[in-house]
A protein has these predicted regions:
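Acidic, Mg2+-coordinating active-site environments of NTP-dependent enzymes
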Residues: 5-157, 181, 206-215
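Active-site beta-alpha connecting loops in nucleotide-dependent enzymes
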Residues: 143-145, 161, 165-215
Length: 215
């Protein structure tokens, strides 16, 4: 980030990926927020207000963060959330100027609504209109390895295999749970979890079992 000197800094969450190197979520928080220290003067900070650590972030370099999240205490938030299974999620998105619009986030999973809110915050910062932001959200393409739905004659495959961590793995299981029919989870290893590797893999397995995944 010191090379890029960003104009806009966005942090979507403080999970447990890279615990092997940073030991605690607080350590991950310190590392992720370092890019804000490298931000250009007068830049914009956009943070997930639903994250327990990010929501407590005080002004940095004299800049107060803009928060997005599901609750209406955030500057950018969503309600009337209606999951549409693997087709995505319908919702109403609210902007800071009391503007709102209905849209469908075309990628499955409630967590994708949060990501769309982050995008809306960036769009507003860059001067996009609500109509342009809505069009951008509804035109989101899927990419290989990230919540990508692949349909065959017999199967529907949810390809969410890139660089998984416990938070993303649980979100993917939630999406699988929305599907109709027999549900099979093929889960790989989660790396860089350090001394917490065993317990976190067990936690994800128990989560899948609780959700009623068939295999």
């Amino acid at each position: 980030s010191s090379v890029a000197s960003p104009d806009i800094c966005v942090i979507t969450n403080i999970g447990v990926a890279h615990l092997e190197f940073f030991k605690t979520r607080e350590g991950i928080f310190r590392e992720k927020t370092q890019m804000i220290q490298d931000m250009k003067n007068g830049g914009t900070i956009i943070l997930n207000g639903d994250d327990d650590l990010l929501s407590q972030t005080a002004p940095i370099k004299g800049v107060s963060p803009i928060f997005f999240g599901m609750g209406d205490e955030n500057s950018f938030y969503a309600d009337h959330i209606n999951p549409l299974g693997l087709k995505g999620t319908a919702c109403t998105i609210y902007l800071p100027d009391d503007t709102s619009f209905e849209c469908v986030v075309p990628l499955p999973g409630i967590h994708m609504v949060s990501n769309a809110l982050a995008g809306a915050a960036v769009g507003c910062t860059l001067g996009l209109t609500p109509e342009e932001i809505k069009a951008g959200i509804e035109g989101l393409p899927s990419i290989a390895g990230r919540n990508n739905i692949i349909k065959t004659d017999r199967l529907i495959i949810l390809d969410d295999c890139y660089n998984a961590n416990p938070v993303s793995m649980k979100a993917s299981i939630d999406v699988l749970d929305m599907a109709i029919g027999r549900k099979v989870a093929v889960l790989g290893d989660m790396g860089e979890l350090g001394e917490h590797t065993g317990e976190l893999h067990k936690e994800v397995g128990e989560y899948a079992a609780k959700k009623g995944i068939d295999l």
